[in-house]
């Protein structure tokens, strides 16, 4: 097992909402999360103390962050400061996003 190149089965997989699955890989100070959203699935409004930045890598979704709403597609990036309410609704194509959290989200380990 390599410290630098994780195996495909390393990390953890969770269904966080119906139709929304995450695959995570923690480091000492941050966490990588691959979020796969089925068509029309929803990440319900929530907030957390972690900073979050991300990029849509496939499909498209409506992001609502701090009351501001925007449709984001492949290559679009976003940032969610600590404590800011946010939600995501996948469109008909579904969506895949890559998120980075700081610090590590213990609830996703």
Task: Spell out what each predicted region is.
Residues 33-47:
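Conserved short histidine dyad/triad with adjacent acidic residue
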Residues 44, 53, 68-71:
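Short, surface-exposed secondary-structure edge patches
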Residues 1-29:
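A short, N-terminal "cap"/entry segment at the start of jelly-roll beta-barrel domains
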Residues 31, 60-62, 69, 85, ...:
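Structural motif
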Residues 46-48, 52, 86:
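Histidine-centered active-site/metal-ligand motif
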Residues 68-82:
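Short acidic-glycine-tyrosine-enriched beta hairpin
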Residues 82-107:
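Ligand-binding loop in jelly-roll beta-barrel domains
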Residues 50-61, 66:
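Glycine- and acidic-residue-biased ligand/ion/polar-headgroup-sensing regions
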